[in-house]
Amino acid sequence: MSLVAIGINHKTATVDLREKVAFSPDKIHDAMKSLAKCTKTGEAVIISTCNRTELYTNTGDEAEVIRWFEEYHQLSHEEVEPCLYKFEGQGVVKHLMRVSSGLDSLILGEPQILGQVKQSFAKAREAGSVAITMDRLFQNTFSVAKKVRTETEIGAAAVSVAFAAVSMAKHIFSSISSTKVLLIGAGETIELVARHLKDNGVDSMVVANRTLSRAEGMCDEFGATAITLEQIPDFLPKADIVISSTASPLPILGKGMVEKALKQRRHQPMLLVDIAVPRDIEAEVADLDDAFLYTVDDLQSIIEQNMASRREAAEQAEVIAENESHLFMEWVRSLESVDSIREYRTQSMAIKDELVERAINKLAQGGDSEQLLLELANKLTNKLIHAPTQALTAASRQGDLNSIGQLRSALGLDKN
């Protein structure tokens, strides 16, 4: 058997096609069982996220895996084939290690994908579609992803606006977990900011939004307080950090409002991060002594520097993935050799048992023991040397000196 993987991701397919080939969480368990039945080893793992759908199997039949994929999603070969990428053997191992380490992600080095791969593997275990090879492959991959995180700086620098905003706050405040944060807006970016803040131990968050119900929905997840935009002046004086991202055409925070809040704070410093376009916070706020205002342009320059750092770290990570994939394939080959040795020994023992049984029967019938012993030795020798003799003859006819040399070495003909 050999490892085979096929997939579609953000680089090869449109959102429309990615949606069509995605596996819903409630159906992926049965899908893995179904795919596993198509393989001779019964091993299959499916990874399905918003940016990729990938099938990992331990089978030698790539065409069968592709056929199953197309039939499951009721798509034609013409729709799928142009967007499909395929890997075999070591290519599968290296690709999975790259994916799990964030080297193949939309945002280079993003850590979320490792958790998604782990969830997929756990579901495959539940479905019973994992055996020795897939188990070893994924466990090794998780170790490699951890190694990439600890031995390179691929995850150290912020490369998203939301992450960069929180990273900046961490640099300014010695203990971000004890700060009070006001978030303005309730869109995807602010939700991501809230998640990063929560991960860094921030418990005191207020979310201000034009639509209160939208803010309340987000606050339920993060244990925050929801308010309307009109209530901002009441909550602003309590905020150590303000991060804003709305679609408002006009500024939400003016210099006067911030100045008044700073007076009430007795001029304790306030960090304001405006990641909206157009701006949510008037530029003049930066003129206030105790206000530290950063815009999306400031963050973008940080992100560009950090992305360069990540690309450098990614080169180191690629070397790790390459080396580790080689080591895994050595284990696979050793597994194959163990199976071959076991099969060869079983076959040889069966030949021996058959010939010995015949000799015993003839001996019981009064046969000459010396003659039977000689006959047994000759027949056993002929049976055991038959396959190597055929291999040597075939290699000789083809002029395959390399195979002849290997066979001579294996048979011990070159000793002494």
UniProtKB/Swiss-Prot annotation:
Binding-site residues for NADP(+), renumbered to this chain: 185-190
The site (Important for activity) lies at 95
Query: Catalytic positions?
Result: 50
Question: Per the record, what are the reactions this protein catalyses?
Answer: (S)-4-amino-5-oxopentanoate + tRNA(Glu) + NADP(+) = L-glutamyl-tRNA(Glu) + NADPH + H(+)
Give the InterPro entries listed for this entry. 4pyrrol_synth_GluRdtase (IPR000343), 4pyrrol_synth_GluRdtase_dimer (IPR015896), 4pyrrol_synth_GluRdtase_N (IPR015895), GluRdtase_CS (IPR018214), GluRdtase_dimer_dom_sf (IPR036453), GluRdtase_N_sf (IPR036343), NAD(P)-bd_dom_sf (IPR036291), Shikm_DH/Glu-tRNA_Rdtase (IPR006151)
- Select a single GO molecular function from the record's annotations and give it: NADP binding
EC number(s) in its UniProt entry?
A: 1.2.1.70
What residue range is the signal peptide?
none
SUPFAM superfamilies the UniProt entry points to: Glutamyl tRNA-reductase catalytic, N-terminal domain (SSF69742), Glutamyl tRNA-reductase dimerization domain (SSF69075), NAD(P)-binding Rossmann-fold domains (SSF51735)
| Top EC class, one word | oxidoreductase
Does the keyword NADP belong to this entry?
yes
Mind listing the UniProt keywords for this protein, alphabetically? Answer: NADP, Oxidoreductase, Porphyrin biosynthesis
Q: Could you tell me which pathway this protein works in?
A: Porphyrin-containing compound metabolism; protoporphyrin-IX biosynthesis; 5-aminolevulinate from L-glutamyl-tRNA(Glu): step 1/2
Annotated GO biological processes are: protoporphyrinogen IX biosynthetic process from glutamate
| Source organism superkingdom | Bacteria
Cite the binding residues for substrate: 49-52, 105, 110-112, 116
The entry sums up its family as follows: Belongs to the glutamyl-tRNA reductase family.
Free-text comment about domains: Possesses an unusual extended V-shaped dimeric structure with each monomer consisting of three distinct domains arranged along a curved 'spinal' alpha-helix. The N-terminal catalytic domain specifically recognizes the glutamate moiety of the substrate. The second domain is the NADPH-binding domain, and the third C-terminal domain is responsible for dimerization.
Which NCBIfam families is this protein grouped with?
Answer: hemA
The further comment given in this record reads: During catalysis, the active site Cys acts as a nucleophile attacking the alpha-carbonyl group of tRNA-bound glutamate with the formation of a thioester intermediate between enzyme and glutamate, and the concomitant release of tRNA(Glu). The thioester intermediate is finally reduced by direct hydride transfer from NADPH, to form the product GSA.
Q: What is its biological role?
A: Catalyzes the NADPH-dependent reduction of glutamyl-tRNA(Glu) to glutamate 1-semialdehyde (GSA).
Subunit structure, as described in the record? Homodimer.
Name under which the protein is recorded: Glutamyl-tRNA reductase
Q: Which organism is it from?
A: Shewanella woodyi (strain ATCC 51908 / MS32)
